[in-house]
């Protein structure tokens, strides 16, 4: 049940420090008298209702447990008309604490001879509407903390009003209980039983304090009220519906030293470890936390109006509504986490508090506090941790170096461990049903058994074969081992030139769909096809060197000399043994290279033959010219070429001219032969040879230059 304040967003309690000055709100006498009259009227109405029901023998209507009519002034808690404390279970917190020896929120006592404590139904709960003065600072007495005075229309009176109520106030309930005769004894017994159950050691001291306060009660009501504040039960309405109590400095000390007080879900989620481990391991550091948090509390209490913006900042950072108590708990928990930074850290909480630092700095500028709240938090972080890496961490998160100049005067260590997230170690697990397993090698016996099972059952029932085979082998493993290793249809080793030519044709047809390529080849697997294709492409991209050409030609000449069939598969293996290149040559590439080398040799031979023909033709022309120029003594004295006609000197001149004209028109090579030779050499892609016209003598009809005419 959350307390709702109509006039402000201030939570149920302000927390004051030891240095704050006591200030009490002033009320007029008329207001005090009005409140007294209202209380008397309420009591009279209650008595009339009880008498009316008693005469009519009608059971009284059940009043809401939280209604103001059931407030017993003598006890200060909800009770019945028999002066027996009737405390509903919803009012008790989840845990009890030991503050100054008095249980502030005691657990329900074991009333064996009294009425049974019952829970009130949800529809009967009516929470009193509480109001609080926004401008009144918290009340402090003798350096001890106390909650702010509350004004209420339901029976909770203010401090000044309590001083004038003849010791019938709710705040003096414990002292007045000790004055009554029978009722006091019952309550003493009940409280002593509760204290023994809850192990409260300072029970007797508290009773003595109560008696001393009761003796001085009639003399000075104001002092009595202030002294009884040490034992008052302060009701703080939590979000869960239970009421928790805090009064003294020990309250804050216990609040900030134990995570058990994190009754709210928001604060308990921020606790990483149990409260016991914190208290046992870091008992010495709790005092440092309390000391470091007091200046922060002092500044909040001394600055009027700053509580609401601070709570708003906390609610914005944590994205939830928060009270002052929860705010201080979060600050203390953060300091604990900083202490435990060497062991464990929660990054989410650090981000929250660094956002808070930035916003609180702007708030200090608005209230002209010179960043005092901001600086005190930074000082507390650095001093408690005492490490250089904490200073670096603060700088990385937006805190300036000027704000950390005080660290130069502090001796800092460098022992804290860096915040490192451990990488998850990935483990390889079984591949059965989608999970990877360790490698399961095949033995010779398993391979032989697989061959037998395949011959018996065929190459399709792999699950059946795997179950019969055993050894942890799956159906997929059996199928792959059969198709890639044991099948007699699959070839192993290097490819010949015919297979490689077929491979390139099928790749042009199907692309890189290796299953379809392997289906058409039938003698190679898809993996073999893929490997051979890329190997051939990489081999073609590298140029041949002279050493490789020599090895290739020597190997082929040896094969021809031994009358062996030329196998380029063996030639490629021979080249691979030489290790002239990183990538071995394929059989098809060796074949294409040999054809290239052979064609160049043929072209060179043709070139040599052509040169011999041209030289012979030039020699014949020279012989013809020599026969024409030199005269012969007799026709049989010198050999006469067949192309030269026999000329008689006794022939008439006209016949000689006709013979000379016929002789000039004769050519050594016909035109058709020249065209055929030119076409032959032009058709060759490697070397082209053109017949020069200069090698063919062409004779023109010139009478002046004719040697026969000169005779």
Curated annotation (Swiss-Prot):
GO terms for molecular function: DNA binding; DNA-binding transcription factor activity, RNA polymerase II-specific; RNA polymerase II cis-regulatory region sequence-specific DNA binding. Residues 24-50, 158-187, 198-235 have a biased composition (Low complexity). Gene3D superfamilies: Homeodomain-like. SUPFAM superfamilies: Homeodomain-like (SSF46689). Residues 462-486, 514-538 bind DNA. Transcriptional activator that initiates multicellular development by induction of adenylyl cyclase expression. This is Myb-like protein B. It comes from Dictyostelium discoideum (Social amoeba). The gene is mybB.
């Amino acid at each position: 049940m959350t307390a709702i304040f109509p006039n402000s967003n201030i939570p149920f309690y302000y927390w004051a420090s030891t240095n704050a000055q006591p200030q009490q709100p002033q009320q007029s006498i008329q207001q005090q008298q009005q409140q007294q009259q209202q209380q008397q009227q309420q009591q009279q109405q209650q008595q009339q209702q009880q008498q009316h029901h008693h005469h009519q023998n009608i059971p009284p209507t059940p009043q809401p447990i939280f209604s103001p009519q059931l407030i017993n002034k003598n006890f200060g808690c909800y009770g019945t008309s028999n002066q027996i404390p009737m405390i509903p279970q919803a009012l008790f917190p989840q845990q009890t604490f030991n503050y100054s020896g008095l249980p502030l929120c005691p657990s329900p006592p074991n009333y064996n001879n009294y009425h049974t404590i019952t829970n009130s139904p949800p529809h009967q709960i009516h929470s009193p509407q509480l109001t609080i003065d926004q401008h009144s600072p918290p009340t402090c007495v003798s350096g001890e903390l106390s909650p702010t005075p509350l004004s209420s229309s339901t029976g909770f009176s203010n401090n000044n009003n309590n001083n004038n109520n003849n010791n019938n106030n709710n705040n003096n309930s414990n002292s007045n209980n000790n004055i009554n005769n029978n009722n006091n004894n019952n309550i003493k017994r009940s409280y002593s039983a509760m204290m023994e159950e809850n192990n409260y050691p300072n029970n007797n001291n508290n009773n003595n304090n109560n008696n001393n306060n009761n003796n001085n009660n009639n003399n000075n009501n104001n002092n009595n009220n202030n002294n009884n504040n040490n034992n008052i039960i302060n009701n703080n309405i939590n979000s869960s519906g239970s009421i928790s109590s805090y009064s003294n400095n020990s309250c804050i000390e216990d609040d900030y030293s134990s995570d058990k007080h994190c009754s709210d879900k928001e604060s308990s989620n921020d606790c990483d470890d149990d409260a016991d481990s914190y208290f046992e391991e870091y008992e010495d550091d709790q005092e440092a936390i309390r000391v470091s948090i007091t200046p922060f509390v002092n500044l909040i209490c001394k600055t009027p109006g700053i509580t609401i913006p601070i709570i708003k900042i906390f609610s914005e950072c944590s994205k939830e509504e928060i009270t002052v108590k929860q705010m201080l708990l979060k600050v203390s928990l953060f300091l604990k986490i900083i202490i435990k930074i060497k062991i464990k850290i929660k990054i989410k909480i650090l981000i929250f508090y660094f956002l808070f630092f930035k916003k609180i700095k702007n708030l200090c500028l608005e209230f002209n506090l010179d960043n005092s709240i901001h600086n005190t938090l930074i000082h507390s972080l650095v001093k408690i941790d005492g490490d250089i890496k904490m200073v670096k961490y603060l700088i990385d998160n937006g805190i300036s170096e000027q704000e950390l100049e005080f660290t130069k005067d502090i001796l800092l260590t460098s022992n804290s461990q860096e915040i490192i997230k451990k990488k998850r170690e990935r483990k390889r697990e079984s591949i059965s049903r989608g999970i990877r397993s360790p490698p399961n090698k095949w033995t010779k016996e398993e391979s032989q058994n697989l061959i037998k099972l395949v011959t018996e059952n065929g190459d399709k029932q792999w699950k059946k074969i795997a179950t019969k085979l055993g050894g942890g082998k799956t159906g997929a493993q059996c199928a792959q081992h059969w198709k890639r290793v044991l099948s007699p249809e699959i070839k192993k080793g290097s490819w010949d030139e015919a297979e490689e030519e077929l491979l390139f044709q099928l790749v042009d047809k199907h692309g890189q769909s290796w299953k379809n390529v392997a289906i058409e080849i039938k003698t190679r697997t898809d993996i073999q096809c893929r490997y051979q294709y890329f190997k051939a492409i990489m081999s073609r991209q590298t140029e041949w060197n002279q050493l490789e050409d020599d090895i290739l030609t020597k190997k082929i000449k040896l094969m021809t000399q031994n009358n062996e069939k030329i196998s380029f598969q063996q030639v490629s293996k021979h080249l691979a043994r030489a290790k002239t290149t990183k990538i071995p040559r394929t059989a098809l590439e060796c074949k294409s290279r040999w054809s290239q080398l052979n064609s160049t040799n043929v072209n060179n031979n043709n070139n040599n033959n052509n040169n011999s023909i041209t030289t012979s033709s030039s020699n014949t022309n020279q012989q013809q010219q020599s026969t024409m120029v030199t005269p012969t003594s007799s026709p049989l004295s010198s050999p006469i070429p067949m192309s030269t006609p026999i000329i008689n000197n006794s022939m008439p001149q006209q016949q000689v001219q006709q013979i000379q004209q016929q002789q000039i028109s004769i050519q050594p090579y016909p035109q058709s032969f020249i065209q055929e030779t030119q076409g032959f050499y032009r058709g060759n892609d490697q070397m082209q040879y053109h017949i020069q016209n200069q090698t063919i003598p062409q004779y023109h009809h010139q009478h002046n230059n004719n040697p026969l005419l000169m005779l």
